[in-house]
């Protein structure tokens, strides 16, 4: 179920503060965040966030197409190695 429209998008307050500070400083450095649940807002376009995936911060460059999505969608937490190959099928 999606979030109610009247509530508006959820963003952790520290993410907003860090983004605002980065805009004011003018530097284009990676902003480290741990809030995968926060929504990407239009004011984040052009910034680079380091989204934590449980092991390291994955750099994510924010574009206009990402507005309304969550930060966690761009930082996968699981690594897929593929299914184990069938040894009997390889021998033939």
UniProtKB/Swiss-Prot annotation:
Pfam families: Ribosomal_S19. One of its GO terms (cellular component) is small ribosomal subunit. GO terms for molecular function: rRNA binding; structural constituent of ribosome. Keywords: Ribonucleoprotein, Ribosomal protein, RNA-binding, rRNA-binding. One of its GO terms (biological process) is ribosomal small subunit assembly. The keyword Translocase does not apply. Disulfide bonds: none annotated. Belongs to the universal ribosomal protein uS19 family. Protein S19 forms a complex with S13 that binds strongly to the 16S ribosomal RNA. This is Small ribosomal subunit protein uS19. The gene is rpsS.
């Amino acid at each position: 179920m999606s979030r109610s429209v009247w509530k508006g998008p959820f963003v952790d307050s520290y993410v907003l503060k860090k983004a605002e500070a980065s805009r004011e400083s003018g530097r284009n450095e990676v902003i480290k965040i741990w809030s995968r649940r926060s929504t990407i807002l239009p004011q984040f376009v052009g910034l680079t966030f380091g989204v934590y995936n449980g092991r390291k911060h994955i750099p994510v460059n924010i574009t206009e197409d990402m507005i309304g999505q969550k930060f966690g969608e761009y930082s996968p937490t699981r690594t897929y190695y593929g299914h184990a190959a069938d040894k009997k099928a390889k021998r033939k």
